[in-house]
């Protein structure tokens, strides 16, 4: 069974199965359009003459009416086609009444029938926090059940082909998330409703917000570049080992060697194997030289500096990806907290949408961390730490009066810079750290699977965008 799981073909089949499941869910989500249509009916604008009685009105088409109480001719601008209570709806009407009064009526209805679509079932404080935090913990823990099934333990040649496919899936997911989810939501105009007039709103749009979003995306890319350069500088100048050796050997009958090494050598913790191989090689040289077991004066030059450089680069990219994931989880937490403020049904729908989005995202992050030098357990623990960002976002949305911050994120605008800045980070990690790994020489079948994996990651983000 383990041998079958290690086959990268089965992983490709699994990704396609997941995409098919997303299509089924997307098809089912089509029923949700009915709710949106009804909601639009409540806020839309239509011209018509309504047929109303004492209890409710059903607005449709054009015509004339004689009402049972206000007997007269009415011309109204109704918002939507709906069955309403006596004063339900938002209408501007001119009525000529034969019994009581004549004149111009202007009403803003705020009441709806029990069970009408879009109603907010307000929750008490304790229940609200329990639902919101429970949903956040669910979306943070659920992907780990999928990670346990991935037969990749470390970045070793035995798992290289499968890891490359997962990396391609990760790059597609990151790019799709940035261009199809974060940036479009940041560009969406948002409206402001007042409590006195919930039906009225005005949107902000224009070149200013678009330019601002673009600048924040670029700021995210530049910020991640600066962070990576800083980390490389801290690790040792260029992020990889430098060994400048000036060897001065004085040979005699005992073959004593003397060397001077200048420069600092900084290695990742996971790079212990090359040093042990150097020691073995040095031991063999000492044996050939007559059994000299004295200490060496300086370290030997690394066998493959380019390979060590690559490993260090990837380790930095792993931490950068964690930082971007932390910010992204914060926005997810804001959306969940704000949605539960709007009602239990809206909160559950948002939670399911975020969960479908997080599963492929966490798989991609796991692949990046393993490629960066982490073991499977280390990668899972590091990903679990990013759940702190989601919990912080949920708490922020719940503590903010009226859920203003969270509502903007849930609606797509977000606190000005968070979404586009995170998108810039995702673009940097995908293009600078992950995609270059896919350019390594591989067989035609492996290359095809990697391209399919990338397209699969993008397809998942397309489905998520459709669901939202």
From Swiss-Prot:
InterPro entries: ZIP (IPR003689). It catalyses: Zn(2+)(in) = Zn(2+)(out). The modification Pros-methylhistidine is found at residue 64. The chain crosses the membrane at residues 10-30, 132-152, 163-183, 208-228, 385-405, 409-429, 447-467. It comes from Rattus norvegicus (Rat). Homodimer. Rapidly phosphorylated by CK2 following Zn(2+) treatment. This phosphorylation is required for efficient cytosolic Zn(2+) release. Transports Zn(2+) from the endoplasmic reticulum (ER)/Golgi apparatus to the cytosol, playing an essential role in the regulation of cytosolic zinc levels. Acts as a gatekeeper of zinc release from intracellular stores, requiring post-translational activation by phosphorylation on residues, resulting in activation of multiple downstream pathways leading to cell growth and proliferation. Has an essential role in B cell development and is required for proper B cell receptor signaling. Residues 36-56, 64-100, 249-312 have a biased composition (Basic and acidic residues). GO terms for molecular function: zinc ion transmembrane transporter activity. It is found in: Endoplasmic reticulum membrane; Golgi apparatus, cis-Golgi network membrane. It is a multi-pass membrane protein. Residues 36-116, 237-313 are annotated as: Disordered. Residues 237-248 have a biased composition (Basic residues). Keywords: Endoplasmic reticulum, Golgi apparatus, Ion transport, Membrane, Methylation, Phosphoprotein, Transmembrane, Transmembrane helix, Transport, Zinc, Zinc transport. GO terms for biological process: B cell differentiation; intracellular zinc ion homeostasis; regulation of ferroptosis; skin epidermis development; zinc ion transmembrane transport. Belongs to the ZIP transporter (TC 2.A.5) family. KE4/Catsup subfamily. This is Zinc transporter SLC39A7. It holds the Pfam family Zip. Induction: In cardiomyocytes, high-glucose exposure up-regulated SLC39A7 expression and induced its phosphorylation. GO terms for cellular component: endoplasmic reticulum; endoplasmic reticulum membrane; Golgi apparatus.
């Amino acid at each position: 069974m383990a041998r079958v799981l290690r086959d990268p073909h089965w992983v490709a089949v699994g990704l396609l199965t997941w995409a098919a499941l997303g299509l089924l869910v997307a098809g089912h989500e089509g029923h949700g359009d009915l709710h949106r249509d009804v909601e639009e009916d409540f806020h839309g604008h239509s011209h018509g003459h309504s047929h109303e009685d004492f209890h409710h009105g059903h607005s449709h088409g054009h015509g004339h009416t004689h009402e049972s109480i206000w007997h007269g001719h009415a011309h109204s601008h109704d918002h939507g086609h709906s069955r309403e209570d006596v004063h339900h709806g938002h209408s501007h009407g001119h009525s000529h009444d034969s019994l009581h009064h004549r004149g111009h009526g202007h009403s803003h209805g705020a009441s709806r029938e029990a069970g009408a679509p879009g109603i907010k079932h307000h929750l008490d404080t304790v229940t609200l926090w329990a639902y919101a935090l429970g949903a956040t913990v669910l979306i943070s823990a659920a992907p780990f059940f999928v990670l346990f099934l991935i037969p990749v333990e470390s970045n070793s040649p035995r798992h290289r082909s499968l890891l490359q496919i997962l990396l391609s899936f990760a790059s597609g997911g990151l790019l799709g998330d940035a261009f199809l989810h974060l940036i479009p939501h940041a560009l969406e105009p948002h409206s402001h409703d007042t409590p006195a007039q919930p039906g009225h709103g005005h949107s902000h749009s224009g070149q200013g917000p678009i330019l601002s979003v673009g600048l924040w995306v670029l700021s995210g890319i530049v910020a991640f570049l600066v962070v990576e350069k800083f980390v490389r500088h801290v690790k040792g100048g260029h992020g990889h080992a430098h060994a400048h050796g000036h060897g001065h050997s004085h040979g005699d009958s005992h073959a004593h060697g003397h060397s001077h090494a200048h420069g600092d050598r900084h290695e990742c913790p996971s790079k212990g194997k090359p040093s042990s191989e150097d020691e073995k090689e040095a031991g063999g040289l000492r044996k050939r030289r007559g059994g000299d077991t004295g200490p060496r004066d300086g370290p030997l030059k690394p066998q493959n500096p380019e390979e060590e450089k690559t490993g260090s680069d990837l380790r930095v990219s792993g931490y950068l990806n964690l930082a971007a994931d932390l910010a992204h989880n914060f926005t997810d937490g804001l959306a969940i907290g704000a949605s539960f403020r709007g009602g239990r049904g809206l909160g559950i729908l948002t939670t399911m949408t975020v969960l479908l989005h997080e599963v492929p995202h966490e798989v991609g992050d796991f692949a990046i961390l393993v490629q960066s030098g982490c073991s499977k357990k280390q990668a899972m623990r590091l990903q679990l730490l990013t759940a702190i960002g989601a919990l912080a976002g949920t708490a922020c949305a719940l503590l903010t009066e009226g859920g203003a911050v969270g509502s903007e994120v849930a609606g797509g605008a977000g606190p000005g810079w968070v979404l586009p800045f995170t998108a810039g980070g995702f673009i940097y990690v995908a293009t600078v750290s992950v995609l270059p790994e896919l350019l390594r020489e591989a067989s035609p079948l492996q290359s095809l699977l990697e391209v399919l994996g990338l397209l699969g990651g993008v397809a998942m983000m397309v489905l998520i965008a459709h669901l939202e």
